[in-house]
Amino acid sequence: MTKPKDTYTSEQIQVLEGLEAIRKRPGMYVGGTGLSALHHLVYECVDNAIDEVMAGFASTITVRIGVDGSCTVVDDGRGMPVDPMVSDNPAIDGRPAIEVIMTQLHAGGKFDDNAYKVSGGLHGVGVKCVNALSKWTDVEVTKETKTWMISFSRGEVDKPLHIVEEHKGKKRRTGTRVTFLPDPEIF
């Protein structure tokens, strides 16, 4: 172990970008890197699905654990927003809302009563932890007549938001499917 410097100056101050802080210090966000932290990732996705049920927009939640260790949480709620953000911040303006939700700390719809009266999880942080601490994350959203998908690798956009299916004029079920593989570099 190296001895700390006798002086404490601006040279020791770090500014971490994006989800880097979560990957660097997962214990601050999910309580560590052990089994309970791994479970915390699942709970965050389930909490989001429960929020849709509690708000009266969903009735079914499905959780699947894959043979590869991945986890999928599906709800039949409204589906995460996929429309472009409108913001004075040029780093956010025009980006798909789902991308911002998955990658920007403290971005979400649970800070006031406009989208949810009751909600669980780490508001504006939870699903970002899942994304940051996973080797890969796929999010699929069905809204109106389309199914959209966005993919991430260790918290970074891997495949931008795109339409994976058009439902030929007929309205389909709505909802969100989050599938992630916890990162073996972390857990």
Name the predicted role of every residue range.
Residues 1-46, 50, 100:
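Bergerat-fold GHKL ATPase/HATPase_c domain
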Residues 2-12, 69-97, 108-187:
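GHKL-type ATPase core
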Residues 21-24, 28, 51, 55, ...:
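Conserved helix-loop functional segments at active or binding sites
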Residues 34-38, 65, 122:
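Secondary-structure capping and boundary motifs in well-ordered enzyme cores
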Residues 35-60, 126-133:
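Conserved ATP-binding N-box helix of the HATPase_c
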Residues 54, 64, 169-171:
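Sterically constrained small-residue positions within well-ordered secondary structures
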